[in-house]
Amino acid sequence: MYRVPIHEWDESDQPREKLLTHGPTVLSDAEVLALLLGSGTRTSDGPVSAVELGRALLQSYGSLHEVSQRKPKELTRTRGVGPAKATKLAAAFEAGRRVESQRQQDERMQVTCPADVADVYGPLLRDLDKEVFKVVHLNTANVIIGDYTVSEGGLSSSVVEPRGVFEQAILDDAAAVICLHNHPSGNPEPSREDIRITRQLAEAGGTMGIPVHDHLIIAGTKHTSLAERGVID
């Protein structure tokens, strides 16, 4: 069966022309993926357009969101998607996550509840395959003024210690901090080590005059507040 290449389609049907003429919101999910992929490919059955590759990815994973959660190696399981195309997609989705997180940070958001912090940092942490421990710095009005990554790859008292948590907070003149880390397993329940470290940091913060308002665990789209659990007084 002969497949008509995209460049031979009617201009009004070509994803690039549709975007330039009508804007990105008119594009289907398959067309958005096609523009990110950049081009189609050739298989033993003949040429496959970028839009067809986009449809194949959506069929494989069910939705654009699910495609965005996949690692490059997983994306290459779809026929016609090689490492180059897979890394393009992964980079584009990561850019989107960073833009959303930075947009909320740029608004100098005031923290009124744990969900506020989860909304800002969840997109950056929830899809990682290793644990990352971050500290969010707040001013006296509970507005986010900065953040600092303390450790990557695991959570233990030898990696997360008070000095590493509060040193940068002092330099930023933070009035308080909120700690957070992710659980790649997707389980938002705190471990014994999570609770122990939280109490250790809260005690150190009280001594230094930089209180720890909360410690959030990000797990997928869920989060747990250890302050709400009563771990932090």
From Swiss-Prot:
Q: What is this protein called?
A: UPF0758 protein SRU_2338
User: Known Pfam families for this protein?
Assistant: RadC (PF04002), UPF0758_N (PF20582)
Recorded family membership? Belongs to the UPF0758 family.
Q: Which organism is it from?
A: Salinibacter ruber (strain DSM 13855 / M31)
Per the UniProt record, the lineage of the source organism begins with: Bacteria, Pseudomonadati, Rhodothermota, Rhodothermia, Rhodothermales
Superkingdom, natural source? Bacteria
Q: In this protein, which residues make up the domain named MPN? A: 110-232
- What keyword terms does UniProt attach to this protein? Hydrolase, Metal-binding, Metalloprotease, Protease, Zinc
* Cleaved signal peptide residues: none
The entry marks the following residues as binding Zn(2+), namely H181, H183, D194
Please tell me which stretches of this chain the record labels as motif JAMM motif. 181-194
What Gene Ontology molecular function terms does this protein carry? metal ion binding; metallopeptidase activity
According to its UniProt entry, one GO biological process term is: proteolysis
Report the transmembrane regions from the record.
none
Query: What PANTHER family does the record point to?
Result: DNA REPAIR PROTEIN RADC (PTHR30471), UPF0758 PROTEIN YEES-RELATED (PTHR30471:SF3)
